[in-house]
From Swiss-Prot:
Reaction catalysed by this enzyme: alpha-D-glucosaminyl-[heparan sulfate](n) + 3'-phosphoadenylyl sulfate = N-sulfo-alpha-D-glucosaminyl-[heparan sulfate](n) + adenosine 3',5'-bisphosphate + 2 H(+)
Organism: Mus musculus (Mouse)
Protein name: Bifunctional heparan sulfate N-deacetylase/N-sulfotransferase 4
Lipid bilayer topology: Single-pass type II membrane protein
Lumenal-facing ranges: 35-872
Upper taxonomic lineage: Eukaryota, Metazoa, Chordata, Craniata, Vertebrata
Subunit and partners: Monomer.
The entry's keywords: Disulfide bond, Glycoprotein, Golgi apparatus, Hydrolase, Membrane, Multifunctional enzyme, Signal-anchor, Transferase, Transmembrane, Transmembrane helix
Residues covered by region (Heparan sulfate N-sulfotransferase 4): 589-872
One Pfam assignment: HSNSD_N
Pathway it works in: Glycan metabolism; heparan sulfate biosynthesis; Glycan metabolism; heparin biosynthesis
Length: 872
């Protein structure tokens, strides 16, 4: 009994002691939490006067420079994984615009509220080098399983995260970011933004400097923290203490912070708003560079060329006088202090010399007396648009007049650059313009804003046609009517906004090479051209580490294609699909001469038979024959493509009814061409695609026999088995023959390439065996696929010729029209050794084809079913 009483007393004593200990612990924790928070508040207190001081002297404990774990870029592909709120969210679109302008590869996915994240690795390598969340809350609120997977991937593959937090009316005034020692204060109005010059992520951005004035909007988020992993990147002040009463307006607050990865091993950069504020765009680009280990980074070199079009052109009152020309010369010298080798590039139309007022004519004369101070390029003599000239000789006459004017007045004629008025004839290509340019001026370079389209500007590219390098041209907000500052469209503040962090600044920021289009009228009156580029150069110099420089046009073009060699080959489009393109395309030309469907091959599968069957239909019309490649144009897969769309369209007759008539072409080399799908989709995106498949082993053997019949030296020297089994040591002609035998049979690979550019509804796959045995049924299927009318009865129009061994067209009087002697040749059967080898060689390809056909909902041809049975 006493033992029980003692135990009860001891138990009560233990309970009291535990309760006392818990209470003391709570009091101590509360004290330190409170003092820690107060300490943090004190730590970030400073004044605006300190904003340009050494950041080490600022009272930020977290600003102490710390060692950051280097990013290992070898474990991942240089691709960004972007989680967006929706496909059309504004911030998501702004992020994509910067990624695309910077030419960074990315994959966009909708951020899952619940559910799995996309696969992050492939064959042991990370698929993404950086992860961006449009809404960082989607990241922190992930379920524990997926968040653990994501963070494990980030740690193992040295991957970082960028996140944005955009407060809204439903945001709490204060929030703690789940899983982080980080407090967020939402819906704050801010002003006077400065860059932390000690931030390790700065690359393009220069600090310290202050952007005075209120920041756009009152929905900003500021970050507070009490951990050494965080470092401020962008600092701001409160507009007033009304935002959050417990925050001081005499304090600098971080609206972008960098997480050095000291907390959990993952580096991050967090933004307290979207990208509407221009400095956020600048820091965002630097954050991508830093967090990707410089794999996704922009060079600091920027090449700019300022063209002044329409020299001597313009009505009275809009041209340059003597004072304007002197200002042009003075400003050119001023700009050279910030832009190495800066020189204005003047485009002249000699016909309009001395057509202004007396003062303006004197300005013309001073320009010509200063001819050696500038670079010069020819416009058209009469400022006519080249596409309005339908023959080369007329263009040559105009150019000769301008050239004679240049020679008379000492204007250099050998700079190799020209620009067409309104970019006419450059793209869409007017072949007469390119020929005349080369003949008269020896032009090597031109520029246009129209390729592939005017907007969005970030998609503009260069290309080379007829040995003339075409560079993308940029607008700068100055047009022929933009003469007076106060009358600038939308008000002068719009021009200033474009210069100071807006569209014009971003053009410089995101493009390594920029050719700006301006006009003579922009340098008279209020001289907005001078105002724009002086202020732009000052702004770029003040806020960035970019190195501005100018190169002559030909050197600039070579530099451009050194940077972007993949752009050398053009990608032709239908001029009638873009109103601007149609407006600068000759009215004598038509878009009706383009095919509605393509028979793409592959070779030796029955494409010629299908071609002849199609021609039997009264509404189906093929291309005209080529003198070199017979019934095949072979446009999309080879050098013919560089002859341009006019060359291609000349092969097609004018349809009597563009609605009911179906133009088509058959080129069997298209099937396995790497270029053809992309090129075809660009020019005829709505075209339907027909391909024929037979056993790839039979196709390979048929090609070999075809080459023997055409006396291919390699086919005559080596038997079929030697061809298909030859190794890397083989002579070039044998390797070429082997590729032509084997590679077209990779059916799934090639079809997937076409499906990357055309929808499944645009593709018809024909069973080659069925086409040979039952063509009428196949042709009924083809007619249905094309939607062609009237329905043509092939059962009555085709007859089997036992002597030929295939189906022929039945003519009046019982006569037949069959394929030529070269078709349907009888070859010795394939040897069993080759058959066995090819069956093994194509096994995986056939399995992939079966998966593809299943996905497309198409039946498996009999030959494929037989081959798959061998796999089992």
């Amino acid at each position: 009994m006493n033992l029980i009483l003692k135990f009860r007393r001891s138990f009560r004593t233990l309970i009291v002691l535990l309760a006392t200990f818990c209470l003391v612990s709570i009091l101590i924790s509360a004290y330190f939490l409170y003092s820690g928070y107060k300490q943090e508040m004190t730590l970030i207190e400073t004044t605006a006067e300190a904003e340009c001081a050494d950041i080490k002297d600022l009272p930020y404990r977290s600003i102490e420079l710390r060692t950051i774990k280097p990013i290992d870029t070898s474990k991942t592909d240089p691709t960004v994984l972007l989680f967006v709120e929706s496909q059309y969210s504004q911030l998501g679109q702004d992020i994509i615009a910067i990624l695309e302008s910077s030419r960074f590869q990315y994959q966009m996915v909708i951020a899952p509220g619940k559910g799995d994240i996309p696969p992050l690795t492939d064959s042991g390598k990370g698929k993404y080098t950086l992860i961006i969340y449009e809404n960082i809350l989607k990241y922190v609120s992930m379920d524990s399983w997926n968040r653990e997977l994501l963070e494990k991937y980030c740690i193992e593959y040295s991957v970082s995260i960028i996140g944005f937090h955009k407060a809204n009316e439903n945001s709490l005034p204060t929030t703690q970011l789940k899983g982080f020692p980080l407090n967020l204060f939402n819906n704050v109005a801010l002003k006077d933004c400065s860059v932390n010059p000690q931030s390790p992520l700065l690359h393009i951005t220069k600090g310290p400097k202050v952007e005075k004035g209120p920041l756009p909007g009152e929905d900003w988020t500021i970050f507070q923290y009490n951990h050494s992993t965080y470092q401020p990147v962008l600092l701001t002040e409160l507009q007033s203490e009304k935002s959050l009463s417990f925050l001081s307006s005499q304090t600098l607050y971080a609206t972008i912070i960098q997480d050095l990865g000291l907390h959990d091993g993952i580096q991050r950069v967090l933004f307290g708003n979207n990208l509407n504020f221009w400095l956020h765009k600048l820091i965002f680009i630097d954050a991508i560079s830093f967090l990707s280990g410089k794999r996704l980074t922009l060079s600091l070199d920027r090449y700019i060329l300022v063209d002044i079009d329409d020299i001597f052109v313009g009505k009275e009152g809009t041209r340059m006088n003597v004072k304007d020309v002197k200002a042009l010369l003075e400003t050119q010298n001023l700009l050279r202090t910030q832009v190495a080798n800066f020189t204005f590039n003047l485009g002249f139309s000699g016909k309009f010399y001395h057509t202004g007022t007396e003062e303006e004519d004197e300005g013309d004369d001073l320009l010509l007396r200063s001819v050696d101070e500038f670079w010069w390029f020819p416009h058209m003599w009469s400022h006519m648009q080249p596409h309005l000239f339908h023959n080369e000789s007329s263009l040559v006459e105009q150019m000769i007049l301008n050239k004679e004017f240049a020679l008379e007045h000492g204007i250099p004629i050998n700079l190799g650059y020209a620009v067409a008025p309104h970019h006419s004839g450059v793209y869409p290509v007017h072949i007469q313009l390119y020929a005349a340019w080369k003949k008269v001026w020896g032009i090597q370079v031109t520029s246009t804003e129209e390729y592939p389209h005017l907007k969005p500007a970030r998609y503009r590219k260069g290309f080379i046609h007829n040995s003339i390098m075409v560079l993308p041209r940029q607008t700068c907000g100055l047009f022929t009517h933009t003469i007076f500052y106060k009358e600038y469209p939308g008000g002068p503040q719009e021009l200033d906004k474009s210069i100071k962090g807006g569209e014009l600044f971003l053009t410089i920021l995101l493009n390594p090479i920029s050719i700006f289009m301006t006009h003579l009228s922009n340098y008279g009156n209020d001289r907005l051209g001078l105002y724009t580029f002086v202020n732009l150069a000052n702004f770029v110099h003040s806020w960035t580490n970019l190195k501005l420089q100018t190169l002559p046009p030909v050197q600039l073009a070579h530099k451009y294609f050194e940077l972007f060699p993949e752009q050398k080959d053009p990608l032709w489009q239908n001029p009638c699909d873009d109103k601007r393109h149609k407006d600068i395309w000759s009215r004598e030309k038509t878009c009706d001469h383009l095919p509605k469907f393509l028979v793409i091959g592959p070779q030796k599968t029955g494409t010629t038979a299908l071609y002849l069957f199609l021609l039997m239909h009264p509404s189906i019309i093929s291309n005209l024959p080529s003198p070199k490649t017979f019934e095949e144009v072979q446009f999309f897969n080879g050098n013919n493509y560089h002859k341009g769309i006019e060359w291609y369209m000349d092969f097609f007759p004018t349809p009597s009814n563009i609605t009911s008539d179906f133009l088509f072409e058959k080129s069997a080399n298209y099937f396995h061409s790497e270029e053809a799908p992309k090129r075809a989709a660009s020019l005829v995106p709505k075209a339907k695609i027909i391909t024929i498949l037979i056993d790839p082993s039979d196709r390979a053997y048929s090609w070999y026999q075809h080459q023997r019949s055409h006396e291919d030296p390699a086919a005559l020297r080596f038997n079929f088995y030697e061809v298909i089994t030859t190794g890397h040591w083989a002579p070039p002609d044998l390797k070429t023959l082997q590729r032509r035998c084997l590679v077209p049979g990779w059916y799934a690979v090639h079809i997937e390439r076409w499906l990357a550019y055309f929808s499944t509804s645009q593709l018809l796959i024909i069973d080659g065996q069925q086409l040979r045995s039952d063509p009428a049924t196949v042709m009924d299927e083809v007619q249905k696929f094309l939607g062609v009318t009237p329905h043509y009865n092939y059962s009555e129009a085709l007859t089997f010729d036992p002597q030929k061994g295939f189906w022929c067209q039945l003519l009046e009087g019982g006569k037949t029209k069959c394929l030529g002697k070269s078709k349907g040749r009888k070859y010795p059967p394939m040897d069993s050794e080759s058959r066995t080898f090819l069956s093994s060689y194509y096994r995986d390809h056939n399995v992939e084809l079966s998966k593809l056909l299943h996905r497309l909902g198409q039946p498996l041809p009999s030959w494929l079913r037989q081959e798959l049975q061998k796999v089992r």
